[in-house]
Curated annotation (Swiss-Prot):
Optimum pH is 5.5. Keywords: Bile acid catabolism, Cytoplasm, Lipid degradation, Lipid metabolism, Steroid metabolism, Transferase. It comes from Mus musculus (Mouse). Changing L99H: Decreases sulfotransferase activity (at pH 6.27). The short isoform L-STL2 appears to be a minor form. It is likely non-functional as it lacks a conserved C-terminus region required for PAPS binding and sulfotransferase activity. One of its GO terms (cellular component) is cytosol. This is Sulfotransferase 2A8. The active site is at H48.
Length: 282
């Protein structure tokens, strides 16, 4: 798996869509504006779901935008090679997304009033989702066995590096007024009130009917159908594993007892200082 990594500042990235030159340029030269909003996650943490929610909030629940425009055009990834230059020349408030850890994030953000929403998810479920997703991307190439993927994840040798370091970096900024940290599990458990919290953070107000439209259009099944219908717009043929289950606790169907114990030990060692209120998972 190591040969498939593009190593940037000690972080392993996929070799597709990313380049050392662009990542460093994003960090050092990309100008984040005060009116920008950026959705940040570690991969497979509910990224697509949160993107859809924010887009629907901005359109007052009207699904036209999310139905007619693919996600990467609505919320472009800052670090993608093709997106960086497009975003640089885009005028007005920008809605963007990123998977970058804080040490590679645009430096200009930290002196701006731009808003970041960071979504954290049970790393056990992140591991399982990533295992299925990244293996599916291989399409005919040799798959990474579950045991090896598990070990790589704990060692920070999976795409985008250590989950623990990524989460720790962003969580450490949670007291800043322009950063909102949410958990996938809480969003799943209490979607309505979590959306209200997002609205308050963004300065958006939804009438009751508009909120109901947002809730209707972010159900897992509707989002999956929407992605399938958009496959012709973007040549997406992998919607079935981009959105696999959308559930919590799936790790219990994959971890052995020994793996669960090993993960618990690693979590206690590496995440001891994390705020416990974020860990609403089983």
């Amino acid at each position: 798996m190591t040969d498939e990594f593009l190593w940037i500042e000690g972080i392993p990235f996929p070799t597709v869509y990313y380049s050392q030159e662009i990542i460093r340029e994003v960090r050092d030269r990309f100008v984040v504006r005060d009116e920008d909003t950026i959705i940040v996650t570690y991969p497979k943490s509910g990224t697509h779901w949160l993107n859809e929610i924010v887009c629907l909030i901005l359109t007052k629940g009207d699904p036209t935008w999310v139905q007619s425009t693919i996600a990467n055009e609505r919320t472009p990834w800052i670090e993608f090679e093709n997106n960086y230059r497009i975003l640089n020349s885009k005028e007005g408030p920008r809605l963007m997304a990123s998977l970058l850890p804080i040490q590679l994030f645009p430096k200009s953000f930290f002196s701006s009033k731009a808003k970041v929403i960071y979504l954290i998810r049970n790393p056990r479920d992140v591991l399982v989702s990533g295992y299925h997703y990244f293996n599916a991307l291989k399409q005919g190439k040799e798959q990474v066995p579950w045991k090896i993927y598990f070990e790589n994840f704990l060692q920070g040798k999976s795409y985008f590096g250590s989950w623990f370091e990524h989460a720790c970096g962003w969580i450490s900024l949670r007291k800043r007024e322009n950063i909102l940290v949410l958990s996938y599990e809480q969003l799943k458990k209490d979607t309505r009130n979590t959306i209200k919290k997002i609205c308050e953070f963004l300065g958006e107000n939804l009438e009751s009917g508009e909120l109901e439209l947002v809730l209707k259009n972010i159900s897992f099944q509707i989002m999956k159908e929407r992605m399938i219908s958009q496959s012709c717009l973007s040549n997406i043929e992998k919607h079935e594993f981009i959105m696999r289950k959308g559930i919590t606790g799936d790790w219990k169907n994959h971890f052995t007892v020994a793996q669960a114990e090993a993960f618990d030990k690693a979590f206690q060692e590496k995440a001891a200082d994390f705020p416990q209120e974020l860990f609403s998972w089983e």
